[in-house]
Each structure stands twice: as C-alpha cells, then as structure tokens.
Amino acid sequence: MVHQSEMENYNIGQASIEEVSDPAYKGAKIVVIGVGGGGSNMIKHLVEYGVHQDVTPIATNTDGQHLKNNPAPVKILLGKESTGGLGAGGIPDIGRKAAEESANEIKEAIKDAKLVIISTGLGGGTGTGATPTIVKIAKEVGALTIAIVTKPFKYEGNQKRKRAEEGLKELEQSSDSILVIPNDKILLTMKKNASTTECYREVDDVLVRAVSGISTIITKPGNINVDFADLKSALGFKGFALMGIGEATGEESAKLAVQNAIQSPLLDDASIEGAKSIIVFFEHHPDYPMMAYSQACDFIQDQAHQDVDVKFGQHTSDNIPIDHVRVTIIATGAERNSGGASLESIATPSQPVVKQTRKVGNGEYLKIPTEEELSIPTTMRIQQD
C-alpha cells in the first residue's frame, strides 16, 4: 500500500515535463489552441499545469481585455479590425468572420504543427463561430485535428444550447475527431455547495486532462511505444472520439484503472459500438508486475469488438508509486447518441462497479458518479448522498 505522503509527492503533470525534457528528443510538434473565453481559460490552466516542450499553447479570442491577461506564450486577437477587440457579442457569424480575418496569423502560428488540438466552449459567439474556421486552417497546413469542446450548462438557456449543437454539426464536417464534454455532467461530479468558481475551474481541469491525455501518449517514450503514426492511423477514422483517464492503487491496479477510465461519466452520449480504433496507454513504475499489466491488456482485448484495432502503449517512471497505475483510453471513429453502448460497454457486465474518487483542495475525496448513477434524477441522487 502506498503511504499518503508518497502519493502527495507524485505529480503526474510535473513528471511529464521532467522525464522527457531531453533536448535530443524530437517528437511531433503539437499545438493546443484555446478559442474564445472558455478555450482561453483552459489554455491559462494548461500553462499553469505545465506542458511538454513539444506542445505550444495558443490563446485566441475576440475579447482583447480577456486575452491580455492570459499567460499563453502565443496570443492571437481574432478580428482586430472587425471587432476592435470588444468580443463577438454571442454572435457566431462575428466569430467566424473574425477568424477568417486573422487566418494568415493563425496559419503562421501553426505552420509546423503535426497535431492541432482545438479546445473551446460551444454556445458563445467566438467559440462557436471561430472554431470550425480554425480547424479548417489547421487542415490546410496538413495537421491532424482534434476538437475538444464543452456544451453549455442547462441553466444557460435553450438559445445557447441550440447554437452549441449547430456549431458541433459544423465541426463534424471538418475536424478529424471530436471529444464532447457536457458541462452538466461535470457539475454532477461536484459537491452540492460547490461555488461557481470551483465548478468552472473543474471544467478547465477536465479540458486540461483531455489535452494532456492525448499529448502524453505521443510525447512520452516507453517500453511499448505509441507514436504519432499510431495516433494518425486512429484519427483516420473520422467521427466522435471517446476518452477516459483512470487511476488505481493496490493489487490489480492496472485492471482497476482501466475500469475507472471506462466508467468515466464526463463524455457526451456516444457509442463505442462501431468504434474503429482503441488506444490504451499505461503509466506505472518500472517494477510493476508484468502479470498484472498483462491481465489488464487481456481484459481490454476480451471486451473490445473483435474487429477493433487495439494499440497498447506503456511508459514507466521511478516517480510513480510501485502499485499505482494510470491509464488513458481513446476510442475513435465512434458514433454519437445512436442508442448503442457507451465507453462503459467494453467492461464486463459482471464486474463490480469501481467507484472513482477525486481529491479536492480541502483533502476530501469526492465520489465521481458512474453512468448508472447519472441516469438517476439529480434531486434523487442528492437525497441519496
């Protein structure tokens, strides 16, 4: 069993930077672009979290004041002439025209990128309008594109939700792959008395975990490597992507981490049925038992569709406690809300549900609800809690 002090000294984000900071390491350049207020907030959070040397964070916005305070090394004011740095006023067409006006500046900033991850909050003017245009620009420079987007809270109103859906449909036509994260599902993981600031920070946390999960797979060298070509092959199947990140400690921690990743409630209604490719990336101590790792791999192979291409990767570090495992799972080419099974459906039904927890600032461990619990009306779940 790992002592609490040992766990507190283990920082995955910091380890990510230190372990692969060798100047001789030359990987595929990754650009992460935050679009609009929500996307730029994520970039700010990502910079504070720490990024790999091959990852370039870029903040873009039509709101000059908001952009001015962002710590991103690259900042692009969209539509300087058309908006005057005063924002898009919640009108997607203004956001689109602003991105078109700044197309050359965007193209110059990402010209060497092999992978461009675009993150935004859909429903507003800049994020909804500019993001599809920026995706198209990234495609023009030959980069693979992944859009990681959030959908508005229900309380934000039908008009904003409608704009978000329209923006999502447009993104489907251009982006290689899309990860959709509904804000309402993030809200369900929070304490009942969580503040607005805490909830929005959690939205940023989820976006950062998604971005970091993808970039980690191709920037961390390992005994069993997943490289850019593997990701490119997986993203060749256009459609929605599903991603889960799980951690576990103790006996069979690799298998439990896989189950935790599979049971993540934070992604939108999408179906693993029809997914064309699955990438599984493990991070653990060099002395982690091979048998436990092998059993976790067998578990995934047994539950995945026989025609799905499953690629495994593995990275080891002395900084990770010996019985602790972190796993990132990405399934691509999935269909959204088709009535099929979710990411959880590749778990064996007879397996016990593994409760996920997350440590918050006050030291309290919060239970992250499973998909089954999320089907229970909020008021009923609050009463159960």
Swiss-Prot record:
CDD domains: FtsZ_type1 (cd02201). Keywords: Cell cycle, Cell division, Cytoplasm, GTP-binding, Nucleotide-binding, Septation. GO terms for molecular function: GTP binding; GTPase activity. InterPro entries: Cell_div_FtsZ (IPR000158), Cell_div_FtsZ_CS (IPR020805), FtsZ/CetZ (IPR045061), FtsZ_C (IPR024757), Tub_FtsZ_C (IPR008280), Tubulin/FtsZ-like_C (IPR037103), Tubulin/FtsZ_2-layer-sand-dom (IPR018316), Tubulin/FtsZ_GTPase_sf (IPR036525). Gene3D superfamilies: Tubulin/FtsZ, C-terminal domain, Tubulin/FtsZ, GTPase domain. It comes from the Bacteria. GTP binds at residues 37-41, 125-127, 156, 160, 204. It is found in: Cytoplasm. Its main location: cytoplasm. The keyword Cytoplasm applies. One of its GO terms (cellular component) is cell division site. Pfam families: FtsZ_C, Tubulin. PROSITE patterns: FTSZ_1, FTSZ_2. One of its GO terms (biological process) is FtsZ-dependent cytokinesis. Belongs to the FtsZ family. Homodimer. Polymerizes to form a dynamic ring structure in a strictly GTP-dependent manner. Interacts directly with several other division proteins. Essential cell division protein that forms a contractile ring structure (Z ring) at the future cell division site. The regulation of the ring assembly controls the timing and the location of cell division. One of the functions of the FtsZ ring is to recruit other cell division proteins to the septum to produce a new cell wall between the dividing cells. Binds GTP and shows GTPase activity. This is Cell division protein FtsZ. It comes from Helicobacter pylori (strain ATCC 700392 / 26695).
